[in-house]
């Protein structure tokens, strides 16, 4: 959620710090600040609001120093004010701390520190860490690294911390517990950040940090220890994408760019997944034929849009592999004593690999004896590292808060898993797998067809921009599409939007319909259970009560009672979510633009939710 950057090296530190924070804006924030390593007393500047407020406050008198830390805050403890913004400092103004996460025992720490004479100036949990570190550093004769190790032992919660002290301004110390932190290795300069996007302009060499590992960074060295001070061998890797992938590339917004990148993202996730003898290739699962055939249940855990991908997984895997599938909201999963045993496969879906609710559910599942397969878009993130296996999607960096291409690649990933499991356990013939895979390979081109005809949809959006309620209806595989359409509209347009299963309409939701209420219906096609006849009845029901009906339907499908029809290419029924979701993304995007909202950084939201 919060964005964290640290820099030490030959550059004027304000430049990599501000640029790094700019590249982390997608994470969501409501204030920003920096601490520069000026000798004697740190230079601190922080402002509520956008990063531009901070930039505008930095005048020509800004000191030219070569180390510092920067932060974008997403408020949890205390409102979004200048005083609550990070960095937070000790009473001497010599030690500064930035923090992502939550310190659960901060009130207890604050009381103890105030009793010792420390003066607090904010409402945050973070300020307690600054004062605690100040005391511990003195106990360790100025050793900030040793102080950090002891501080972490005293803290409860999930967090990433970075600290700097004016007496050794070129040294930055960091630690992570259940929250992301990565080190960037430069030439005579080094970086720390919550995401590699912050420093990819400067280096593509990175180090992944493990749980409770403390990193001490200077311009020419990076040392990592555990909480007992024992050295840890760094795990270096090369970042696979470049800085241009985190630029808008001529599009008005990152979200629009990412919508148009979906054909390539889907194609990249599919490439090379069928062998010459028509076998789905998923070596990453690390499961033998016997282990797959012994599976009795699959549980999918996810949050937000990824949860909707999980719902699609249920339809696909049960259809193809004949294995029962439960789909759980990750934040609820571990609080009800779920039944898990070695015959249970847990599929954890997370774009960032750092979603805290999903990570906690993964740990609970593993402790209960389940095998965990992660579906993730971010290499070397925490959830893949703690899972038994990982299937990486190939969406590339997704900067906009609202998920688009990451969601579609997650759906493609669950299709591949379903086909593989069904093929191995004998529920699908090789010829069936071959034919379905060929249909999957046609999806990128079909998405392009949809994107080539979005202009009428943009015009349509303007006629609905002033409505304050929009309802979405779907049946079977169209139900998660309806939920996703409603979520996107809530996130981006700040409109009350709800998705319902069509069969539930008469059980309450129809009471919401009045004159002029927009209703978007996803018309099923090609289903085995006569669903094609059910949704038209729902359309007539809402139209009779004054609704303005928009229908998403396949080319050639007969539609009655709709004010507007959005056509999508023909595809097998289970693959329709990949296509039907795209016009709903465009609809939500255009609604946000017309209403003047911040498309890439919607209010109150964060890209990667790293607190519970």
In which residue ranges do the predicted regions lie?
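A SIS-like phosphosugar-recognition module
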Residues: 44, 167-168, 177-181, 187-188, ...
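Conserved short alpha-helical segments that host acidic/polar catalytic motifs at enzyme active sites
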Residues: 1-253, 261-296, 335, 448-451, ...
């Amino acid at each position: 959620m919060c964005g964290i950057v640290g820099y030490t090296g030959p550059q004027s530190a304000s430049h990599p710090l501000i640029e790094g924070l700019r590249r982390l804006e997608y994470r969501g924030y409501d204030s920003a600040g920096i601490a520069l390593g000026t000798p004697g007393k740190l230079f601190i500047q922080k402002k509520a609001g956008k990063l531009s407020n901070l930039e505008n406050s930095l005048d020509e008198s800004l000191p030219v120093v070569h180390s510092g830390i920067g932060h974008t805050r997403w408020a949890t403890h205390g409102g979004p004010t200048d005083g609550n913004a990070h960095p937070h400092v000790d009473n001497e103004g010599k030690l500064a701390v930035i923090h992502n996460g939550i310190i659960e025992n901060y009130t207890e720490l604050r009381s103890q520190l105030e009793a010792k004479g420390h003066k607090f100036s904010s409402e945050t949990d973070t300020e307690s860490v600054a004062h605690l570190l100040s005391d511990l550093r003195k106990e360790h004769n100025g050793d900030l690294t040793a102080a950090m190790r002891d501080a972490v032992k005293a803290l409860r919660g999930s967090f990433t911390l970075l600290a700097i002290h004016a007496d050794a301004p070129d040294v930055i110390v960091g630690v992570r517990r259940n929250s992301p932190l990565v080190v960037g290795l430069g030439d005579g300069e080094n970086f720390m950040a919550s995401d590699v996007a912050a420093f990819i302009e400067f280096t593509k060499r990175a180090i992944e940090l493990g749980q409770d590992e403390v990193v001490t960074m200077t311009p020419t060295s990076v040392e990592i220890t555990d909480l007992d001070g024992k050295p840890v061998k760094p795990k270096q890797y090369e970042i696979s994408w470049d800085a241009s992938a985190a630029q808008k590339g001529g599009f008005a917004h990152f979200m629009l760019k990412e919508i148009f990148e979906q054909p390539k993202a889907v194609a990249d996730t599919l490439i090379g997944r069928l062998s010459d003898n028509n076998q789905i290739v998923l070596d990453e699962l690390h499961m033998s034929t016997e282990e797959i055939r012994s599976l009795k249940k699959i549980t999918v855990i996810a949050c937000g849009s990824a949860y909707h991908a999980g719902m699609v997984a249920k339809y696909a895997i049960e259809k193809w592999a004949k294995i029962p599938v439960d789909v759980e909201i990750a934040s609820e999963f571990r609080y009800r004593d779920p039944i898990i045993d070695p015959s249970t496969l847990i599929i954890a879906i997370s774009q960032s690999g750092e979603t805290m609710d999903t990570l906690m559910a993964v740990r609970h599942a593993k402790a209960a004896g389940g095998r965990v397969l992660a579906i993730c878009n971010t290499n070397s993130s925490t959830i893949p590292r703690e899972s038994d296996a990982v299937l990486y999607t190939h969406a590339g960096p997704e900067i906009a808060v609202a998920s688009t291409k990451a969601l579609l690649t997650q759906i493609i990933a669950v299709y591949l898993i379903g086909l593989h499991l069904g093929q191995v356990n004998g529920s699908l013939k090789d010829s069936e797998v071959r034919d379905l895979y060929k249909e999957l390979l046609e999806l990128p081109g079909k998405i392009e067809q949809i994107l080539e005809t979005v202009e009428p949809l943009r015009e349509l959006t303007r006629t609905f921009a002033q409505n304050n309620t929009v309802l979405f209806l779907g049946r079977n595989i169209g139900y998660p599409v309806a939920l996703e359409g409603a979520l996107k509209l809530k996130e981006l347009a700040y409109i009350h939007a709800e998705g319902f299963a069509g069969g539930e309409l008469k059980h309450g939701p129809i009471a919401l319909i009045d004159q002029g209420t927009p209703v978007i219906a996803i018309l099923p096609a090609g289903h085995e259970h006569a669903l094609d006849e059910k949704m038209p009845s729902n359309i007539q029901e809402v139209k009779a009560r004054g609704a303005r009906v928009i229908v998403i339907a396949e080319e050639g499908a007969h539609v009655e009672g709709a004010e507007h029809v959005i056509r999508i290419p023909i595809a097998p029924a289970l693959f329709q979510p990949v296509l039907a979701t795209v016009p709903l993304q465009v609809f939500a995007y255009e609604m946000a633009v017309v209403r003047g909202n911040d498309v890439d950084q919607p209010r109150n939201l964060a890209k990667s939710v790293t607190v519970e």
